[in-house]
Amino acid sequence: MQKSYIKLLVLGDSKTGKTTMMMTYSTGSFPTGYVPSHVDATSLDIEYNKQVCHVGFWDSSALAEFDNTRPSTYPNTNVIILCFSIDSPTSFENVSKKWIPEIRQYAPSIHTPIILLGTKCDLREDENTINLLKENNQMPPISYKQGLALSKEIKATMYLECSSLCNQGVNEIFKQVVRCHLYCKDGVLNDPTTTTSNTSKCIIQ
C-alpha cells in the first residue's frame, strides 16, 4: 500500500529549539553535542490510527540572511509547526508579528494546518529563567493560557507544548502532524476516531 507523503515545514525564531526538537524525535534522545541552526530536509515514517505516512521534515532557518530564500520552502507544504520558546517573550510576540504574516503570504493555502508549539516547557517554573527575564525587564515565561489564547488569535489548528530536554510531548507532536494531514478539511480538524484531548495538552480550535 502506498504511503501518503506529508511535507512538514517547521518555523519560528532562532533558538526556539526547532532543530533540537526534530533531532530528539528522530534519535529518541536529547542532543548533547553541537546543534546546527537548522538541518537539511529529512524524512521518517510516522503512524497515527494505524495509518502510516511518510513525513518530510523541512527545518527553515529564521536567520535574517535567509529571509529572501525562506519563501521557497513553502510550496507544497501540507502542515506547518510554528514554534515559540516559553522562556522567550520575543519569540512569542514574533508569532503574530513576523511569522503569521509570512505564512499567510506564502503558504500554499489559507487552510494549511498550523500547529502552534510552545517549546522548552520545562523552563516555565525554572527559577533561573524567571530571574533572568525579570533582570532584563521582560515578561515572565509564557503561560499555557497565553499560548492557548495566541493559538486562537492566529486561528491555529491546535496548540501543543513540549520539552525536548525531558522528551515530554515530542512524540505526540508528530502524531498530531499526521492527524492534521488526514483529518483537516478547510482548516477544520474533524477526527472521527477520537473525541478526547491527548496527554500533551493538545487543544483543538
From Swiss-Prot:
Record keywords: Cell membrane, GTP-binding, Lipoprotein, Membrane, Methylation, Nucleotide-binding, Prenylation
Positions of short motif Effector region: 34-42
Modified residues (Cysteine methyl ester): 202
Subcellular location: Cell membrane
Lipid-modified sites (S-geranylgeranyl cysteine): 202
Signal sequence range: none
Organism domain of life: Eukaryota
SMART domains: RAB (SM00175), RAS (SM00173), RHO (SM00174)
GO cellular component, one term: plasma membrane
Gene3D superfamilies with a match to the protein in the record: P-loop containing nucleotide triphosphate hydrolases (3.40.50.300)
Key word Metal-binding present: no
Species name: Dictyostelium discoideum (Social amoeba)
The protein's name in its UniProt record: Rho-related protein racI
A single GO molecular function term of this UniProt record: protein kinase binding
Name of the gene encoding the protein in the UniProt record: racI
